[in-house]
């Protein structure tokens, strides 16, 4: 009788241990199932992100980006050439202004030399006439030079904006490619991990079933 009770207690103890093992296995299965569900959700999210990126890439293909960059580069070269021509024209007008000033000084010198022999009144009128004509030329050239400087400044600012835009497009294109590469690699890794975890989970379930059947 005593042996029978001890055997029953031992069997009960062993059964409790097995139940604990099964509980641990069940907890492990639950955790793995939760992890798999999370990975499935992550895969769905990655797929959605890939679709969104594909939509972006479809609407803005690489050829379009390259053509846009080439067009902006051409515009920048045209602006630089125009600025060069404006600078050349400005230098020519400044040279013309210096030539006029030189002619004016030469004319004044002749007038001063002739003033000793000619009527002072006529000399004064000639001086006034030449001064007015010279001032008109100086004002006109100064105004043209100011307009050209302003145009050059505006073109240079526009050229800087175009260069910034090209840099932004290049960075955006680079970022899209990096994101696509990361998502592809992550998706492949998830598939590999899921395959290995599914194999482990199947083995664990099989072992648990075998243990239950033996009991």
Swiss-Prot record:
Source organism superkingdom: Eukaryota
Major subcellular location class: cytoplasm
Compartments where found: Cytoplasm
Single GO cellular component term: cytoplasm
Ranges in a coiled coil: 5-104, 161-185
Entry keyword annotation includes Cytoplasm: yes
Disulfide bonds listed in the record: none
Keyword hit for Coiled coil: yes
Gene Ontology biological process: response to wounding
Keywords for this protein: Coiled coil, Cytoplasm
Start and end residues of each stretch annotated as Disordered: 194-215
Biased composition (Polar residues): 197-215
Family, per entry: Belongs to the SIKE family.
Function of the molecule: May be involved in wound healing pathway.
Name of the protein described by the UniProt record: FGFR1 oncogene partner 2 homolog
Species of origin: Pongo abelii (Sumatran orangutan)
Lineage: Eukaryota, Metazoa, Chordata, Craniata, Vertebrata
